[in-house]
């Protein structure tokens, strides 16, 4: 199960945070800093996308200048969540048309809607890009 999902840029600014476990505001701030300090200096060529973190694992993937991080239980399948992160980015790319950091900042409510279509209650919910995009199309018609 996911504890949280963070999208941060190279400077450590959080562009999206979704919490699936209860944390206080102080804990959230501390976690954001710790996760960024853990994943930002890692070398993509020589180090894996999985990092031990407290009693969990951080599964992360870097796209351009953004780090997509998910905190999962140690007994969860890391590769499934790594693929789910990639799937989430593919859906963002298809929805926004070559997504960038500014899309996340100015359309954060749509990004949260996409995230909620892919993940539900800390678990992977949907794995079909076409199903997610169809649902998002219906949501866009309501606006």
Curated annotation (Swiss-Prot):
GO terms for biological process: clathrin-dependent endocytosis; protein transport. Transmembrane segments: none annotated. It is found in: Cell membrane; Membrane, Coated pit. The keyword Membrane applies. GO terms for molecular function: clathrin adaptor activity. Keywords: Cell membrane, Coated pit, Endocytosis, Membrane, Protein transport, Transport. Its main location: membrane. This is AP-2 complex subunit sigma. It comes from Gibberella zeae (strain ATCC MYA-4620 / CBS 123657 / FGSC 9075 / NRRL 31084 / PH-1) (Wheat head blight fungus). The gene is APS2.
């Amino acid at each position: 199960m996911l504890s949280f999902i963070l999208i941060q840029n190279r400077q450590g600014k959080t562009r999206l945070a979704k919490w699936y476990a209860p944390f206080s505001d102080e804990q959230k701030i501390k976690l954001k800093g710790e996760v960024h300090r853990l994943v930002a200096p890692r070398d993509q060529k020589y180090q894996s996308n999985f990092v031990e973190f407290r009693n969990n694992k951080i599964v992360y993937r870097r796209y351009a200048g953004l780090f997509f991080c998910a905190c999962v239980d140690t007994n969860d399948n890391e590769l499934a969540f790594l693929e789910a992160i990639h799937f989430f980015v593919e859906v963002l790319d298809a929805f926004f048309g070559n997504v960038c950091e500014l899309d996340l900042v100015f359309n954060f409510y749509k990004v949260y809607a996409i995230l909620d279509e892919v993940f539900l209650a800390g678990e992977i919910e949907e794995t079909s890009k076409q199903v997610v995009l169809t649902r998002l199309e219906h949501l866009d018609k309501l606006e």
